[in-house]
């Protein structure tokens, strides 16, 4: 009987102890410490902080767990929490309101996570925070007023991150430092401020001048854990210690060039040069009128610290390449620009270029192309350059064998495309672009022939054959058409010989020099061919008649 009573007593005591013991999360351990109740979760399988934390916790320590973010509302039942350790997890994001339920928080440790930035204004909800440990993350910047809401912070560790530039104002605006400045003689009763900045890839240029001065003169109340901040860049200062490096004052770029006026003969190569000096080193870009049509190589090379030489290489300059070339340099301080005027002198004969002239000595260079085929038609695109400063109007003429009257479209300044819709199958069309109201005979033309209608819209997607019926029109030969001519049943010379009766003795068309020979013109898209053999008009009489018109 005594033995039975003893067993009953043991079970009763065990039940009472279990009933009194507070709840603890699975995979975690709870304990009573001198500062209060503590929860430790090591190598948990959870992906977020559980929402059923035991109440009245003073410390939470979660480490080596797949924890990815701190979201708003995670700490709803933890208003008394003072110590939060979330080291060696995978935290990448801290939401702005994640800390709003932690008014008593005094210590936040986030070592060894994957943070790229910190929502510094979130610390408005934790005015009692004294320790902030962010080492071994991926933070690459700290705003100048980052610490303004951390009024009681005395320990900040942002070492082993990806910081390259930090203003000394970040630390001079530290509220604890400002408080010392205000108290003056009574400041000796305040705690020192511990700061850790080492093992960052510091870029030692003028932007770190203030921090370098701060490190050189650092002393109480500041204590640097490691004052040896090593420069990783620029190359000339790599490996040097920041406090031993002489850094100049930042300045915006200044630009110079050997010549602001450059004159060359057409067809010659030319290189425009631009020198930019700035601190920190500038970035250089070029702007010129035909940048959307002709793309030139740009070479950049450092001449000295803070001095960059940029070269714009123009191969086989054409008349249309003349104009203003703007060299632009910019850095974090400002930007500057310089204009270089390029003048391309014409040669006696200009094969490959087509000019439109008027009686008032106004001329224009025109490059007319068929750049795209749609289900219902084609898209024409052109490049025009006139010898007058004011913008010019152009007239687009579209005719066909079937149409009784030609279509006339007046094109205003700034427009360089036109869609031709509702094309008939098996029909030859001619599009000409003229200056102002000049007749189409004085413009540049492109001729295209639609293929047979092979069944519905799907067939119409492949009905276009761009072909050039006249040798004279080869001046406006689009890239797609030129590919067809060079790959068709005749070679280029034979085709011209068959189609140009006046030039059959020479076996070539002297004016038929295809544009884009140097591939410098950017062709938005070639014309789609349908795989059928291209047919040249069979009647020589029709060709000759077209040549007369």
Curated annotation (Swiss-Prot):
Sequence ranges assigned to domain LRRCT in this UniProt record: 200-252
UniProt keyword Repeat present: yes
GO cellular component, one term: membrane
InterPro entries xrefs: Cys-rich_flank_reg_C, FN3_sf, Ig-like_dom, Ig-like_dom_sf, Ig-like_fold, Ig_sub, Ig_sub2, Leu-rich_rpt
Segments of skewed composition (Acidic residues): 538-549
Glycosites: 90, 261, 491
Transmembrane segments: 463-483
Region (Disordered): 521-549
Chief location: membrane
Annotated ranges, domain Fibronectin type-III: 361-447
Signal sequence region: 1-22
Start and end residues of each Ig-like domain: 253-339
Subcellular location field: Membrane
Residue ranges of every copy of the LRRNT domain listed in the record: 23-54
Paired cysteines (S-S): 274-327
UniProt membrane topology term: Single-pass type I membrane protein
Keyword Membrane belongs to the record: yes
LRR repeats: 80-103, 104-125, 128-149, 152-173
Complex and partners: Interacts with LRIT1; may form a heterodimer with LRIT1.
Protein name: Leucine-rich repeat, immunoglobulin-like domain and transmembrane domain-containing protein 2
Gene: Lrit2
């Amino acid at each position: 009987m005594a033995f039975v009573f003893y067993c009953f007593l043991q079970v009763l005591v065990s039940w009472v102890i279990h009933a009194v013991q507070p709840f603890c999360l699975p995979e975690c351990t709870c304990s009573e410490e001198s500062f209060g109740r503590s929860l430790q979760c090591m190598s948990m399988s959870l992906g977020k902080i559980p929402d059923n934390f035991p109440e009245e916790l003073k410390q939470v320590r979660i480490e080596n767990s797949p924890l990815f973010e701190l979201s708003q509302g995670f700490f709803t039942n933890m208003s008394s929490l003072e110590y939060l350790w979330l080291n060696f997890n995978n935290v990448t994001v801290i939401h702005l309101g994640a800390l709003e339920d932690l008014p008593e928080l005094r210590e936040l440790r986030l070592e060894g996570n994957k943070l790229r930035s910190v929502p510094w204004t979130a610390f408005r909800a934790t005015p009692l925070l004294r320790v902030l440990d962010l080492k071994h993350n991926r933070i690459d910047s700290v705003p100048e007023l980052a610490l303004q809401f951390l009024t009681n912070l005395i320990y900040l560790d942002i070492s082993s991150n990806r910081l390259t530039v930090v203003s000394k104002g970040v630390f001079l605006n530290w509220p604890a430092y400002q408080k010392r400045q205000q108290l003056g003689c009574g400041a000796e009763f305040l705690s020192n401020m511990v700061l850790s900045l080492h093992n960052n890839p510091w870029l030692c240029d003028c932007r770190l001048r203030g921090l370098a001065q701060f490190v050189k003169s650092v002393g109480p109340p500041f204590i640097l854990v490691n004052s040896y901040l090593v420069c990783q860049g620029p190359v000339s200062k790599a490996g040097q210690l920041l406090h031993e490096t002489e850094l100049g004052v930042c300045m915006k770029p200044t630009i110079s060039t050997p010549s602001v006026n450059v004159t060359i003969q057409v067809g010659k190569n030319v290189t425009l040069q631009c020198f930019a000096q700035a601190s920190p080193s500038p970035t250089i870009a070029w702007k010129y009128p035909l940048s959307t049509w002709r793309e030139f190589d740009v070479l950049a090379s450092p001449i000295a610290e803070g001095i960059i030489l940029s070269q714009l290489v123009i191969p086989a300059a054409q008349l249309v390449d003349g104009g203003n070339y703007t060299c632009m340099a910019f850095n974090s301080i400002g930007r500057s620009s310089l204009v270089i005027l390029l003048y391309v002198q014409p040669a006696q004969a200009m094969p490959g270029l087509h000019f439109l002239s008027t009686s008032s000595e106004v001329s224009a260079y025109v490059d007319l192309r068929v750049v795209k085929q749609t289900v219902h038609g084609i898209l024409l695109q052109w490049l025009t350059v006139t010898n007058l400063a004011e913008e010019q109007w152009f007239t687009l003429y579209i005719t066909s064998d079937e149409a009784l009257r030609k279509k006339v479209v007046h094109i205003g300044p700034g427009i360089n495309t036109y869609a031709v819709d509702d094309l008939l199958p098996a029909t030859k069309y001619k599009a000409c672009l003229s200056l102002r109201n000049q007749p189409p005979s004085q413009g540049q033309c492109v001729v295209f022939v639609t293929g047979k209608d092979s069944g519905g819209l799907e067939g119409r997607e492949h009905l276009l054959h761009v072909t050039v019926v006249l040798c004279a029109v080869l001046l406006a030969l689009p890239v797609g058409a030129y590919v067809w001519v060079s790959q068709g049943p005749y070679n280029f010379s034979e085709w011209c010989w068959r189609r140009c009766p006046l030039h059959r003795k020479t076996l070539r068309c002297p004016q038929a020099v295809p544009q884009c020979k140097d591939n410098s013109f950017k062709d938005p898209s070639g014309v789609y061919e349908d795989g059928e053999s291209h047919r040249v008009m069979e009647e020589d009489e029709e060709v000759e008649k077209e040549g007369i018109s």
